[in-house]
Amino acid sequence: MAQKPDGGAGLRGFQAEASVEDSALLVQTLMEAIQISEAPPTSQATAAASGPNASPQSSQPPTANEKADTEVSAAAARPKTGFKAQNATTKGPNDYSQARNAKEMPKNQSKAAFKSQNGTPKGPHAASDFSQAAPTGKSAKKSEMAFKGQNSTKAGPGTTYNFPQSPSANEMTNNQPKTAKAWNDTTKVPGADAQTQNVNQAKMADVGTSAGISEADGAAAQTSADGSQTQNVESRTIIRGKRTRKVNNLNVEENNSGDQRRASLASGNWRSAPVPVTTQQNPPGAPPNVVWQTPLAWQNPSGWQNQTARQTPPAARQSPPARQTPSAWQNPVAWQNPVIWPNPVIWQNPVIWPNPIVWPGPIVWPNPMAWQSTPGWQSPPSWQAPPSWQSPQDWQGPPDWQVPPDWSMPPDWSFPSDWPFPPDWIPADWPIPPDWQNLRPSPNLRSSSNSRASQNQGPPQPRDVALLQERANKLVKYLMLKDYTKVPIKRSEMLRDIIREYTDVYPEIIERACFVLEKKFGIQLKEIDKEEHLYILISTPESLAGILGTTKDTPKLGLLLVILGIIFMNGNRATEAVLWEALRKMGLRPGVRHPLLGDLRKLLTYEFVKQKYLDYRRVPNSNPPEYEFLWGLRSYHETSKMKVLRFIAEVQKRDPRDWTAQFMEAADEALDALDAAAAEAEARAEARNRMGIGDEAVSGPWSWDDIEFELLTWDEEGDFGDPWSRIPFTFWARYHQNARSRFPQAFTGPIIGPSGTATANFAANFGAIGFFWVE
């Protein structure tokens, strides 16, 4: 027991000299060692060893599952009853006495598992062929050795061991499935056997020295206890690099023609080697000197070859025949453009044109009923109609065809009774035949160049001035009622509510309404926005009424004048913070409701902005956002910067010229306003003269009963039960007040300084403030 069995050379000598009886004794001892093992193999190891698709042990490095099987097999082995190599020396000269190699076994390898693969004896008198056995692992105890018999028949104690004759190589190929390793052997050429054997011997040596490497999963198929026999067809098991030519022959079958082809592979789970084996044979497309062990890569076990591009049948590749253009294009309609009429031209009734006529432009002659001529066509000066020429019965003349000036109508030529005349075809001085009396020419007759149609035309039809003036009076009442809210009036509203069907003459109606407003009420209709066409009512310079309003609006307009002054003195713009700071000094605060002004914030940011007195906008590029106030469009027309500056100077008992910059700016604006007013007055006078508008426009009766209150829309609160309560003042009283004004009608100029008279200064102050209401 001092010597350790050699699992390498001793096993090869045992394989060469063993007899049938010795083989039977060895198998019986092996079976007893397995049956009396202390711990049965686990279900995991049994399942791995008896799987249906188990592949033989490979010369490749083991995987994790193979390591687990080795540990289970080592734990299941009997500690002390294992077969000892030195006990095999009791059989004589030709027995196991050659187990001398047990002394030569390395001391670091205490145990080795003997593995008999493809253990089918070749005959009744032949020794058992344990063709492949290799050390696969070590157990926990170095004095124990486990024998693992694969592909050996298990039987009872009294069973006689009969080893059937080994089938031939062709029969094994046909009857047994091929594994991944067996197929991989067939892919190598015979010339590479020696080199591959050396490589495999080196790998087996590495496996033998590794303590944690076990068999591959499903390396051998074990038979069940009932005696059923399974055979392993592993043909590529290496015993220290020894491999016979028979291994390659297992995967090759001979056919009648003498050529060799690869046998089909059985279905199973293919497993690729984690580490490639280097060789000089390179599969197609593989890196240099590397053979990949994956059977599905680079190799095709079924002999399948890459097919060339799929050939389309000749019939399927034929493209449809190209569309063939008809030999002759059939056009039932003759080409009509351009048309060159040769000479002669034969009509339905034979008509011979004496001179050739070439039509200059495109002419379409679809049929005689829709005959068209070119707009600029003129007949030759010397053309005469033949005496016997008759027009077709269904022929219609062109609507814009001009008759030659010197063309005389044939005496026997007559038009059809139902022939329609074009509106501009007959000249005014052309003689009309007696049978044309029933035809009524259109009033839009146009004469030829040498006709005297202008002498026969009478004066233009006079307009109904009374209807236009009546509609203008309605517009005056409408504008005065709409101005109650101080919201600018849109031209579209005037056209929709009052003018209506007189839209073609609406400029004259609006101008007549302006004339009535100026002459009777001292009010002027001013267009403040040329793009949106917004209109407001302002007092004329002669009325000295200032800003129109009622008594209840006096506090609001006074506050508005103060705000306009603050904006003007701060560079024509004032931020919201600056404006509220100035109003706080007057006792006015936002958020506190005033008894007369109401909500101050709403008054400044909504009402005055809607009435176009102020412009409230965001300061550009302000973060957080800030807002500022500017003058509105209405403020520029109802007052001026010079009036506001004089108001501020009067309050502070100072001269307006003390603020030099503001005074010069206000003076320039006043001069520009005078020039614009003079140009506008001249344009109005010219328009009224052209329209015939004079004093007779205001001479007629005046009545308020024809006003349509349902057309008016109101944005402020009011007494909707009594429409007349919406009128802010009595119009006739206002008219007479303007006539009896105690202020002079003519001023010395837009700028009144301290040198003016007291009456002039008083009038200027009131004009600057802009408040003069009828009580």
UniProtKB/Swiss-Prot annotation:
Biased composition (Low complexity): 39-50, 309-326, 375-406, 437-452
Cellular component per GO, a single term: protein-containing complex
Chain residue ranges for the region called Disordered: 37-330, 374-409, 437-463
UniProt topology in membrane: Peripheral membrane protein
Region (22 X 6 AA tandem repeats of W-[PQ]-X-P-X-X): 292-441
Tissue: Ubiquitously expressed in many adult tissues, except for the spleen. Expressed in osteoblastic and chondrogenic cell lines and also during embryonic development.
Deletion phenotype: Animals show shortened circadian period and reduced total activity.
Annotated GO MF terms: identical protein binding; transcription coactivator activity
Domain MAGE: start-end pairs: 468-666
Compositionally biased spans, kind Polar residues: 52-63, 84-100, 107-120, 149-178, 221-235, 247-258, 296-308
Sequence repeat boundaries on the chain: 292-297, 298-303, 304-309, 329-334, 335-340, 341-346, 347-352, 353-358, 359-364, 365-370, 371-376, 377-382, 383-388, 389-394, 395-400, 401-406, 407-412, 413-418, 419-424, 425-429, 430-435, 436-441
GO biological process, one term: positive regulation of DNA-templated transcription
Main subcellular location: nucleus
Subunit (UniProt): Interacts with DLX5, DLX7 and MSX2 and forms homomultimers. Interacts with UNC5A. Interacts with TRIM28 and PJA1. Interacts with NGFR/p75NTR and RORA.
UniProt xrefs under PANTHER family: MELANOMA-ASSOCIATED ANTIGEN D1 (PTHR11736:SF28), MELANOMA-ASSOCIATED ANTIGEN MAGE ANTIGEN (PTHR11736)
Protein name: Melanoma-associated antigen D1
Organism for this UniProt entry: Mus musculus (Mouse)
